[in-house]
Regions:
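Nucleotidyltransferase catalytic core that binds NTPs
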Residues: 1-208
Length: 208
């Protein structure tokens, strides 16, 4: 899987593609549905499968005090996307330049990927302050002759699957329910910083 971390680094136009667009901050079953739909379209029409997302949560720029806790690391996200058969991951920082683009300007940024189809969730928004919605995208698709596929939100029982809901379940200790929405076992990885290791001297060794 090719990984692109800067749009400025893309100098040549790519082969025709389908792009799954989203924050994908949890890569839960709803996010997977969007990506799998894009994958199926890519296979049917012999296109490259691209996932376009951000390396940081958009709220980190817009409302830093409201940045949610991560439920997946960048390394885990890359691993899962590879398993889903993604050809190209565009994982760029959400910065002031991107945040200030109009909906049309944002789509022009994607033109280098030669997309024939865009796949999004029904609550997708894009462009300055999220001014572009799914109906905006559909109108642009009709005008510019590309396909737009909008996926309905996925439910687990009666509840809509969302990263916010999954965070709440994890914080409340309902990890099994969170796992059902994630479609995998919840786990965060990190680096253990070694301490003085006094625990082993009293018969209670700890993680560090």
């Amino acid at each position: 899987m090719e990984i692109i971390t800067s749009l400025e680094a893309v100098k040549t136009e790519y082969s025709p593609s389908v792009i799954a667009l989203g924050t994908f901050d949890g890569l839960h079953l709803g996010h997977q549905d969007i990506i799998k739909t894009a994958r199926d379209y890519a296979q049917k029409h012999d296109l490259k499968l691209i996932v376009f997302t951000f390396s940081n949560h958009p709220l980190s720029l817009i409302k830093p005090d409201l940045v949610p806790v991560r439920i997946i690391t960048q390394q885990q996200k890359i691993k899962y996307l590879e398993k889903l058969g993604v050809d190209i991951l565009v994982n760029v920082p959400f910065d002031h330049d991107l945040a200030g683009l109009s909906p049309d300007e944002f789509l022009k940024k994607l033109a280098v990927f030669n997309y024939r189809c865009l796949v999004v969730g029904e609550n997708f928004s894009y462009g300055f302050l999220g001014s572009g919605k799914t109906d905006t995208l559909q109108r642009t698709g009709l005008h510019d002759h590309f396909t737009v596929i909008i996926r309905q939100l996925v439910k687990c029982g009666k509840n809509v699957i969302s990263s916010t809901g999954i965070r709440s379940l994890i914080q409340a200790g309902h990890v099994e329910h969170a796992n059902q929405m994630l479609g995998r076992a919840y786990a965060l990885t990190g680096i253990v910083t070694h301490g003085a290791q006094r625990g082993r001297t009293i018969g209670f060794p700890t993680a560090n």
